[in-house]
């Protein structure tokens, strides 16, 4: 269950932040929350769970998600990462370049097919 894992990760990050209040802790795991990730991140930052929201795979699928969030807009669901992990499969191959096979398929699907199948 992905949401159980996300909850476990975020509460663990919150414990680390509480234990080290002078160290800015960056979250992880927000990609699983898709278009709701910005709202969850904002609430967690407000409540002191972590200092900054970290987006990894999401930025490969949706490179301008930070701009969307800062503009006060909800991220577009059809641009969000679907957490398929194909980007990490490509990255782990020799000479692999991470990218979103789903959202940028014109570029990364041929690479994925060549290197991962």
Residue spans for each PLM region:
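Flavin-dependent oxidoreductase catalytic cores
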Residues: 1-117
């Amino acid at each position: 269950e992905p949401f159980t894992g996300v909850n476990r990760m975020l509460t663990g990050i919150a414990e680390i932040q509480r234990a080290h209040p002078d160290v800015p802790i960056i979250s992880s795991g927000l990609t699983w929350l898709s278009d709701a990730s910005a709202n969850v991140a904002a609430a967690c930052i407000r409540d002191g769970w972590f200092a900054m929201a970290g987006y990894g795979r999401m930025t490969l699928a949706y490179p301008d998600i930070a701009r969307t969030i800062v503009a006060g807009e909800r991220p577009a669901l059809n641009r969000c990462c679907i957490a398929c992990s194909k980007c990490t499969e490509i990255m782990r191959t020799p000479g692999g370049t991470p990218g979103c096979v789903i959202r940028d398929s014109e570029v990364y699907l041929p690479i994925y097919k060549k290197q991962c199948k």
